[in-house]
Amino acid sequence: MELDAYVSARHGGTGFNPRDLDALLARVERICAAHPERGLAEVWREQKKTWHRGPWKTTMTRCRDILAAGDHNEDAFFFGIWLYAYDQARDGSNIGEALRDIPAGAAELVWKECAHTPDAPLLDVLRRMQGK
């Protein structure tokens, strides 16, 4: 997920589908094994362009979409984590450190903020909550 968020942030990717990650990773691993001279991020970016992008979009997913998915929806949960990592990569931060430093209860805080601003893009809410 970190690699996908990083490549998307750095190379204009906007979609995420957590259900595609395992198959996409397997495909990228095969290509990298056959062509070790190619960079991992380059291969990932190339393969993701041809892959299903999913319903979750960086700038189009609104709080109401997350709320409608329900608080036990794994896809929505992983999209929230991915979007946070995407935003950190876009700002030049270390994604791994940022993900390790997410405070306990952060998801609940995002849910509460989204309930107050259902029409807001989720990315805007995450950025506002970080003081960006």
Language model features: what each stretch is:
Residues 131-132:
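Short, solvent-exposed mixed-charge patches
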Residues 1-118, 124:
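Short N-proximal segments of mature Sec-exported proteins
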